[in-house]
Amino acid sequence: MRKIIVLILLLVVAGKAFSQPRDYNRDYRKHFFWGIAFAGTYAKMKMELDPVFWQRTDSIQSIRPQGQAGGGFGGSVAYRFGKYWELKTLTMLQLHQRNIQYAWQHTPGPNIKIETISFDIPLTLKYRSDMPNNTRMYVLGGVRWSHDFQSNQGLVIGESKPLVALKANTYYYEVGAGMEFRLDFVDLSLELKMSNGLNNALIRVPNSYYSGSMASIYPRLFSISLMAQN
């Protein structure tokens, strides 16, 4: 959070130092925009239990997904068409983690960590308002492909091994909203976004206590991003 605040202050100070008047017609003269982004994330999952879980006669009692914070950085490219619309991609390298807590009848079970280092390419459609007083709002929606470099999809997982693997490639739909602030040389934007998985990402080992007790996992990701765009 401190790094984000410092970045905002540096951009503001740099703009004032050059004392160049703002280009109010920049949006209407340009069609292509590029920028950089830093994001804070909260990774969760939607989990469904397999019917075999309810038929178990062993000591396993419950399985609970847990969310964890993460982050990422990347670059954006946008194409403006019409007065209010943009087609945008925000390529990101993201690091986050999801946990699964197992509870046994007499003792706490293992807390399994699913760590992710992903390369994400979204394609979103953005609708923005006018920009009175150098500020405007926007909404967006689209789809995203995510490739996980940490995936254990190709690993042979034994039935008793405390490991839950997710597929290397997952797909999301996402919606969000944000606010843009015009400075002398760049537009700063603060964006909130929610991404929900479309495909079942679980690699299920049928006789496993761990992944075999679940039918599906759909990853979810909530993010807040700070972007600077030319």
Stretch-by-stretch model annotation:
Residues R22-D23, D58-I63, H106-I112, E159-A165, ...:
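Extracellular loop and loop/strand-boundary signature of outer-membrane beta-barrel proteins
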Residues K30-F32, G67-G71, E115-I121, T135, ...:
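Residues that define the transmembrane beta-barrel architecture of outer-membrane proteins
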Residues M47-F53, I100-T107, Q150-G158, A201-S208:
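Outer-membrane beta-barrel translocator domains and adjoining extracellular loop/strand segments
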Residues A165-V175, M179-N230:
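Predominantly the C-terminal beta-signal and adjacent terminal strand-loop region
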Residues I36-G40, G71-Y79, L93, I121-Y127, ...:
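Residues on the lipid-exposed face of transmembrane beta-strands in outer-membrane beta-barrel proteins
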Residues F53-P108:
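Glycine- and aromatic-enriched membrane insertion/assembly motifs of diderm outer-membrane
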Residues R29, G82, D130-N134, R182-V186, ...:
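Outer-membrane beta-barrel channels and translocator barrels
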Residues S19-G70, Q229:
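Short glycine/proline- and aromatic-enriched beta-strand/turn motifs that initiate or cap beta-hairpins
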